[in-house]
């Protein structure tokens, strides 16, 4: 009888793995060129990565990422901030800069905005600073 292969234990949750995948895709766009198209997709993906990282911390904190009145939907980035700060006591001092990024994302998504490379550089600098800190201090990853 053949022995079944042992599967490696999951090192990252699917939510966290997805956050890193979309972050990687955003960074590929950012470093590929400084066209408005690449800046647009860089910011969309990096903002999504941040939202997923926040949701992962909510999950790790033992809270549901699903809306209480509609379990088919997950909480928004704003819902994640609220749970983190009010229920889990997690400080997010970078929130004002991350709010600007999310506003830029909304402008891209809903108003057809095209960010320039200077604005994208501002958002990427602050986003990456947050991600480095948050992944290390809140998600306990190197």
Regions found by a protein language model. Name each.
Residues 1-42, 139-142:
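Charged alpha-helical initiation segments
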Residues 12-17, 88-142:
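Charge-enriched, short contiguous segments at helix-coil
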Residues 21, 41-48, 122, 126:
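Amphipathic alpha-helical interaction segments
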Residues 22-25, 45, 52, 100, ...:
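Amphipathic, well-ordered alpha-helical segments in soluble domains
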Residues 26-34, 60, 108, 112-115:
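Secondary-structure edge/capping motif, primarily at the C-terminal ends of alpha-helices
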Residues 33-40, 63-68, 117:
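Short, surface-exposed loop/turn segments at secondary-structure junctions
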Residues 39-59:
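Short, hydrophobic, well-ordered secondary-structure elements
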Residues 54-99, 103-104, 131:
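Flexible secondary-structure boundary motifs
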């Amino acid at each position: 009888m053949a022995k079944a292969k042992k599967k490696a234990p999951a090192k990252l949750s699917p939510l966290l793995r997805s956050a890193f995948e979309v972050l990687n895709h955003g960074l590929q766009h950012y470093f590929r060129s400084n066209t408005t198209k690449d800046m647009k997709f860089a910011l969309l993906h990096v903002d999504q990565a941040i939202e997923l990282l926040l949701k992962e911390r909510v999950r790790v904190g033992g809270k549901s990422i699903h809306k209480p009145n509609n379990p088919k939907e997950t909480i928004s980035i704003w819902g994640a901030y609220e749970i983190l700060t009010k229920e889990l006591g997690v400080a997010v001092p970078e929130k004002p800069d991350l709010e600007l990024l999310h506003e830029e994302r909304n402008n891209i998504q809903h108003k057809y905005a095209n960010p320039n490379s200077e604005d994208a550089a501002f958002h990427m600098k602050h986003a990456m600073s947050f991600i480095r800190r948050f992944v290390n201090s809140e998600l306990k990853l190197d």
